[in-house]
From Swiss-Prot:
Transmembrane feature ranges: 46-65, 69-91
Domain of life (superkingdom): Bacteria
Topological region Periplasmic: 66-68
Gene: yfbV
GO BP terms: negative regulation of chromosome organization
Keywords assigned: Cell inner membrane, Cell membrane, Membrane, Transmembrane, Transmembrane helix
Predominant subcellular localization, coarse grouping: membrane
Protein family (similarity comment): Belongs to the UPF0208 family.
Protein name per the record: UPF0208 membrane protein YfbV
Record carries keyword Transmembrane: yes
Cytoplasmic-facing ranges: 1-45, 92-151
Topology of this chain in the membrane: Multi-pass membrane protein
Keyword Transmembrane helix applies: yes
InterPro entries in the cross-refs: UPF0208 (IPR007334)
Length: 151
């Protein structure tokens, strides 16, 4: 995935962008066959909730049973890295420019929002997945569900 040239995205801001993207993306069942975000967001939220206790349990279990500390630490670090991997992927995806097929659909949804009387900020540069998430979130609130029939 490539990032737009006009934005400087460092490693740590990708986590923040991923968190924002996961909160912005509408988790609608009709989007799941086309976009992988629904699955990634659900699994990332699951990992954020359950992987830290699993990491602590793994360490405590190995220490209590007198096992080796090295494999326990490696397993705990792997468990702790899973939520970070999900947030990093979502952050990277949020700044990825839209492919041509989705770009056309993005402009159609924006057009339908504008036809319904919504005031939208102009798109700066090439739209990315974060712009799509913002537009879809607004479309699900303002429009009826038939705007997805073209997808």
């Amino acid at each position: 995935m490539s990032t737009p040239d006009n934005r400087s995205v460092n490693f740590f801001s990708l986590f923040r962008r991923g968190q924002h993207y996961s909160k912005t993306w509408p988790l609608e069942k009709r989007l799941a066959p086309v976009f992988v975000e629904n699955r990634v967001i659900k699994m990332t939220r699951y990992a954020i909730r359950f992987m830290p206790p699993i990491a602590v349990f793994t360490l405590c279990w190995q220490i209590a049973l007198g096992g080796q500390l090295g494999p326990a630490v490696a397993t705990a670090l792997f468990a702790l890295s899973l939520p970070m991997q999900g947030l990093w992927w979502l952050g990277k995806r949020s700044v990825t420019p839209l492919p041509p097929a989705i770009l056309n659909w993005f402009y159609e949804v924006r057009g339908k929002l504008q036809e319904s009387g919504q005031v939208l900020a102009p798109v700066e540069g090439k739209p990315d997945y974060q712009a799509l998430a913002d537009t879809l979130k607004r479309a699900f609130k303002q429009l009826d569900k038939t705007f997805l029939d073209d997808l």
